[in-house]
Amino acid sequence: MPTCPLDQSENVNFFTEKNSHKIYRCQQCGLIFVWPLPSDAKKLYSKDYFEGAKNGFGYVSYEAEKQIASGTFNAFLDAIEKILPQRGKLLDVGTATGCFLEIAQKRGWEISGLEISQHAVDKACQKGLDVKIGELSDASADKPAYDAITFFDVFEHLPSPKETLQKAYNLLRQGGVVAINTPNSKSLPAKIMGRQWYAVNPPEHLRLFDADNLKNLLELSGFEIKSVCRIPKKLSLSYVLTVLANHRKSRMLKKASNLFSKAGIGSWLFPLSFKGNIFILAKKR
């Protein structure tokens, strides 16, 4: 049996198996995690992940969906700017094609991003954005260089969240903030759907947190919790159907998504968050 990657507890139970990956839940801290970790998870983030989702993961059109999410990105920045009204240098981890960075730049932030997908990096650079291939562990600085480091819909993909937060702490200036938006394993949708919850989706999602264990991890990493909330998203009809189709492996839902998109109603928006995400802001002590 594995040990919990957060608290090293051996009190873990088998949770489920999906996509040929075993998933466990720590009975001490509640973390849901994949074990053993897949060795080739990075291969998932090819062009198909951002344009097509033919292999059952990702987006039909990441650019279209993230443009829809501009209101959510602005809400994230509103929360950050309550703590850092002067703005400053912002590093976005897992920046994809740079939709969030475009908005942050327009609001006066000095932006940069990291992304493991070469396809996404190329798209972001075509927009004139400062985005480099790599992970946070690849970032280097002689001294703390950033005022904010963001992980939006990224933390659940990370194989080593503890090490990632320690690196973020070292890269942040005193009083800098880390912002995380990630699925909440204690949310109402998670409780209702159980093992069928959309976020239980390896090898895409490797670690699923709740507010308590994520706050504890941040505090142990040297951060002071400033805000814990849920920021709803406006989701398009096509996106909702695509997520459900991928999760249920349903050709019928996939066809419905494509049909509605061609009919022009796939872009209809719903101001809700069936995903049950959690948004946490923490400040470097």
Q: Language-model segments: what does each one mean?
A:
Residues 1-152, 162-165, 230-231, 243, ...:
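Conserved N-terminal segment of class I S-adenosyl-L-methionine
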Residues 2, 227-285:
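A C-terminal cap/extension of S-adenosyl-L-methionine-dependent methyltransferases
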Residues 5-12, 212-229:
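A SAM-dependent methyltransferase catalytic signature shared across enzymes that methylate proteins
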Residues 152-159, 204:
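Short catalytic micro-motifs in class I SAM-dependent methyltransferases
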Residues 159-163, 190:
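Short N-terminal helix/helix-N-cap motif within the alpha/beta-hydrolase-1
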Residues 162-177:
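A short glycine-rich, Lys/Arg-flanked "PGG" loop and its adjoining helix->strand segment in the class I
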Residues 180-207, 212-218, 240-245:
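Short, glycine-/aromatic-enriched active-site segment of Class I SAM-dependent methyltransferases
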